[in-house]
Structures are given as structure tokens and as C-alpha cells.
UniProtKB/Swiss-Prot annotation:
Disruption phenotype: Deletion of the gene results in increased sensitivity to macrolides. CDD domains: ABCF_EF-3. This is Antibiotic resistance protein MAB_2355c. InterPro entries: AAA+_ATPase (IPR003593), ABC_transporter-like_ATP-bd (IPR003439), ABCF_EF3_subfamily (IPR050611), P-loop_NTPase (IPR027417). Signal peptide: none annotated. SUPFAM superfamilies: P-loop containing nucleoside triphosphate hydrolases (SSF52540). It comes from Mycobacteroides abscessus (strain ATCC 19977 / DSM 44196 / CCUG 20993 / CIP 104536 / JCM 13569 / NCTC 13031 / TMC 1543 / L948) (Mycobacterium abscessus). GO terms for molecular function: ATP binding; ATP hydrolysis activity. The lineage of its organism: Bacteria, Bacillati, Actinomycetota, Actinomycetes, Mycobacteriales.
Length: 552
């Protein structure tokens, strides 16, 4: 029977800090479980332990059924491996070993072509057939045709680094979901996928008979595909795990109820311990003057010792207190005016007016000009006023265009870049960036900068360089800079892509309170539903408005 069972897993980092503490989970046959949690709580480490890539320091892992694994780096492969190499990397062990044997035999035959090499090559071909190698190649043809639109014979030696992140993900997902593995571990399978591909993934996960544990930050995917949600939550003893046996729509209330119950249990435990301790102190004082109290003192001490040995109830998770404060400010009623605007080679001419206070989601397929539109706005438009020009470390590249794009009075753009790539930030520490201001934001002393970083959950990373941060940390820091710049027009390019669920929800709360205009490019369907206007960038170059999200 295919399943995954974790019993009291513990894991320590090289510096001795506990990462995972008493983690237990069962993923039953055919079930789909989403693994979520804040960045740094150990989600990928837990998958590595289940896969056998890392050993737990405490507890045990049991698995039933053949295991297939999609690791986190799929989608960002930039080495010289081929499509064949990628498909073999997620194939069953017997296929992978037989392929390596066949490759060595073929290379030896090409170099020498002796009778012995011919015999070895013939044996390697026979072994390849015995393990189902030719059937594997037939399946590869199905997978490359579905993911890349070309047969395996044409795709097999193509470099993986020539594929987009979405193509790499789709190819591996096709192989794993259509392969013989009964248990799948998928680390962020939705990253790099556009919305149609995410919908495809949802359908495949739901209809698959396989046992699947997947890590994701996509709330729509989790809500549609997961039968249960396992949450890694930080405590002082390390991350613990809680399982919600329902969908994401009921998750928050269930989590709030659970945390309230844990807090109440802890309050009662503290009260009981305080009462027992007071009892011991009372009998100790009396026993000092009355020997008849000695037995009562001993009984009270025994009760306190046994109470302590039983230990406190499960700890309440540490609060993930990310607090974003995007203030904004009043601007002209017409915040953005596009007049016969054409992004060269990307869109046809279009007109639009965006008003102060609008919440506009920019939707469409990859390569349709969405990010270019945001970048042109970040440059201040066609003829920017002095206070609308980009400054400091956040200067975008110019955008070729015809027509006009104007910003209204007092509209000061603040830009969140999709790639998080700002040359002026990369090799500087967070404290240094905050200490040295620019034309739009004041510098801050060490103590004040530390307080600001703490609100974004970045205080422990204060001395790290921007380039060394995780994608989620870089995202939070970019939002922090927008807060300090006093922007009245927020331009957000895929802001939730690398944010954990808690940070994404903190951003949504901050945007709801923001006094200004927000324009965001996004493929996050859950996030998009918080907007009220939608600009759709079509594959045909047309830009149109919609009253509801439309996904190509």
C-alpha cells in the first residue's frame, strides 16, 4: 500500500539549532497533502528526509510504494544537461542504472569496437529492454510532445537550459504524474507555471490515484487539489507540524481555533504549576518549625516533580508577525493616462485611464508586455515630472514605445521588480541599504533600521547582503523599501511569487489600507481576487479591460 509515515521526526542544523521537532504525519494511499509553512521552517528539509537524501536525528520514516521526487531546483536548471538527462533523473532507479550502463557500453564501443565491447554493448541493450527501457522511451515521447510540442527523438539531446522554467516544470510533472511511481514528493511544482498550466496541474493532482505530498504557496492550488493541509509552524524547540483535515477555505478559522485552544491549555497548565509550587513553598515553611509537616512536604514535592516530568502541553506556535505599513498619499484624481500607447513589438495601441485609489490587476500570458507596461510606469511614463523620475537603487531600463503614458500630479511610482535584480542592492547588507538613504527615502540609524527590519521578519538577516537572501526575503525587503519611499503609486510585478502564505496575506492587508493606486502584474489567482479592475494583455497584442479576472 502506497503511503508516507513520519513518526516524531527531529532534525538539527549544523550549528546545533533545532529545525524540526517531534514532526509526525501520515499521507495515506491516494491522498493529496499540501505542506505549507513560513520560509525557513524546514519544508524542503522534510521532503529530503522523506526522500532519503537526509537522515533525521530523531524519529523514523516509513514509505510504501515506489517514490518519485521533484526537487526545488527544477525550473532553474542552467547546466549543460539534456532533456534525456532530466527525464532519467526522475525515472525509476532500475531505468536510470540501465541507462548509465548502456551509455558507458556505447561510449566504449565507439572508442574501441573490440569483440568484448560489442558483447558488453549487446548485453547492455538486453538489460535496457529487460527493465522496460524501450517502454520508458515511448512514454518520454508522450511527455515531450505534451510539454514541449515535439517528439522525444527531436527533444532528447536538447539542452535543458534552452527550456523556460515552465517547460522544465511541465516536462518533469508529465513524467512523474504519468510514470510508474506510486508516491510523489513535489517541491513547489507550480513555480514558473502560468495559470493554464496551474489549472492543468490541479486537474492532474485531483484525478491521480497516486499518493502525493507537495509544497506550495499557491492558495488556489492548495484549495483545489489538497485533501489535507500539513503546516510546519515555528516554536522555540523547532518547527512542529499540525494537520488540517480540510480545504484552504476553512484553514484559517481552524488554525485560529487550534491556537486559542493551545493557549488556553498552556494558561491552565501554568496556573496548576503555580498552585503546586505555592503548596510546596507553604509546606517547606511549615516543616521548618513543625516536623509533622515533613510528610506533606514530601508528597507536595512529589506531585510537583511528576507534574513537571509530564511536561507542558503542546507549545503555541510563534507568531509570524510581519507588519507592512504602506502609507501612500492623496494624488490627482486621474493617476495614470495612456493615450494611444503602444509597447513596441508587444502591444497594439490602447487607451486607458486609472484613477486615484484604483486596484488594477494586469493579467495575460508570458511575453505580452505586462512587465514592460509596469517598467514604463516606473520610469515615470513618457514625460515624467522631476519628482516622478526613478531614483536610488531601483532604476528600471527604458521601454521602447509610441504614444503617451502620463502620471497625474503627486503620483510618485514605487516599483517592485519581478526578478528582484537591482545592481545597486546586490552586494550590500540590509542595514547598509537602510542606513544610506536616497532622494526618496531618508537614512536610518542602526536601532531604527533594526526595528523596521523586525516588522518584516528580517532582523536576523540584517547583516546579510541582499543577494544572499532567499526569494521570499528579497520580496519582503523590496516591499519595505516601497514603504520608506512614500510612493503613491505601487507597481508590483509578481509580488507574491516567492512570499510564503503569511507574508502574502500581510501584503494584502497592507494594500487594503494603502492610500493610493495599486497596479500589479500577477498569476496568483487568489491574490487577483482582491483587485477591482483588470487589464488583460492578449496574445494578439490587444489590451482590454475586464470586470473580472480572465486567464489565457
Amino acid at each position: 500500500m502506497s503511503h508516507v509515515q513520519l513518526d516524531a521526526i527531529g532534525y538539527h542544523l549544523p550549528d546545533g539549532r533545532a529545525l524540526l521537532h517531534d514532526v509526525s504525519l501520515r499521507v495515506g494511499e491516494g491522498s493529496k497533502t499540501a505542506l505549507i509553512g513560513p520560509n525557513g521552517t524546514g519544508k524542503t528539509t522534510l521532503l529530503r528526509i522523506i526522500a532519503g537524501d537526509a537522515d533525521p536525528h530523531d524519529g523514523a520514516v516509513t514509505r510504501g510504494g515506489q517514490l518519485g521526487v521533484m526537487r526545488q531546483f527544477i525550473g532553474s536548471v542552467r547546466d549543460d544537461s539534456t532533456v534525456r538527462d532530466l527525464l532519467l533523473s526522475v525515472a525509476p532507479d532500475r531505468i536510470r542504472r540501465a541507462a548509465e550502463h548502456l551509455d558507458r557500453a556505447e561510449l566504449a564501443l565507439m572508442e574501441c569496437d573490440s569483440e568484448q565491447d560489442q558483447i558488453k554493448y549487446a548485453q547492455a541493450l538486453a538489460d535496457w529492454a529487460d527493465v522496460g527501457g524501450y517502454e520508458f522511451e515511448t512514454q518520454c515521447d508522450v511527455h515531450t510532445t505534451a510539454a514541449l510540442g515535439i517528439p522525444y527523438e527531436l527533444a532528447r539531446f536538447r539542452g535543458v537550459n534552452t527550456l523556460s522554467g515552465g517547460q522544465q516544470k511541465r516536462l518533469v510533472l508529465e513524467s512523474l504524474l504519468g510514470g510508474p511511481h506510486q508516491v510523489l514528493l513535489l517541491d513547489e511544482p507550480d513555480n514558473y507555471l502560468d495559470v493554464p498550466a496551474k489549472r492543468w496541474l490541479e486537474e492532474r493532482l485531483v484525478e491521480s490515484p497516486k499518493t502525493i505530498l507537495f509544497v506550495s504557496h499557491d492558495r488556489e492550488l492548495i484549495n483545489r487539489a489538497a485533501g489535507q493541509i500539513a503546516t510546519l509552524e515555528p516554536t522555540r524547540a523547532g518547527s512542529t507540524l499540525w494537520v488540517h483535515p480540510g480545504s484552504f477555505t476553512t484553514y484559517h478559522q481552524a488554525r485560529a481555533d487550534r491556537n486559542a485552544k493551545l493557549a488556553e491549555l498552556r494558561r491552565r497548565w501554568d496556573e496548576q504549576r503555580a498552585a503546586l509550587r505555592d503548596l510546596v513553598l507553604m509546606y517547606r515553611q511549615k516543616a521548618a518549625y513543625n516536623s509533622d509537616m515533613a510528610s506533606r512536604l514530601q508528597a507536595a514535592e512529589t506531585r510537583l516533580r511528576r507534574f513537571d516530568e509530564a511536561g507542558p502541553p503542546e507549545a503555541v506556535p510563534l507568531r509570524q508577525n510581519v507588519r507592512m505599513r504602506l502609507a501612500g498619499g492623496r494624488t490627482a484624481k486621474r493617476a495614470v493616462i495612456a493615450d494611444n500607447l503602444e509597447l513596441t513589438g508587444l502591444t497594439r495601441p490602447f487607451d486607458t485611464e486609472l484613477w486615484y485609489g484604483d486596484r488594477v490587476a494586469v493579467l495575460g500570458g508570458n511575453g505580452t508586455g505586462k512587465s514592460h507596461f509596469l517598467r514604463l510606469l516606473a520610469c515615470g511614463g513618457t514625460d515624467p515630472e522631476l519628482d516622478q523620475l526613478p531614483v536610488g537603487d531601483m532604476i528600471p531600463e527604458p521601454v521602447n514605445h509610441d504614444g503617451r503614458l502620463r502620471l497625474g500630479a503627486r503620483v510618485r511610482p514605487g516599483w517592485f521588480a519581478q526578478t528582484h535584480h537591482h545592481a545597486g542592492l546586490m552586494d550590500r547588507t540590509l542595514l547598509d541599504i537602510l542606513h544610506h538613504g536616497d532622494e526618496r527615502r531618508a537614512g536610518h540609524g542602526r536601532e531604527q533600521a533594526s526595528r523596521i527590519l523586525d516588522r518584516y521578519g528580517l532582523a536576523p538577516s540584517a547583516e546579510q547582503t541582499f543577494s544572499s537572501l532567499s526569494g521570499g526575503q528579497q520580496g519582503r525587503f523590496q516591499i519595505l523599501l516601497l514603504e520608506l519611499m512614500g510612493s503613491t503609486l505601487l507597481l508590483l510585478d509578481e509580488p507574491t511569487d516567492n512570499l510564503d502564505l503569511h507574508s502574502a496575506e500581510a501584503l494584502e492587508d497592507a494594500l487594503a489600507a494603502f492610500d493610493g493606486t495599486v497596479i500589479a502584474v500577477t498569476h496568483d489567482r487568489w491574490f487577483a481576487r482582491t483587485f477591482t479592475r483588470f487589464l488583460i494583455f492578449g496574445e494578439d497584442g490587444k489590451v482590454r479591460e475586464s470586470v473580472e479576472p480572465q486567464w489565457v
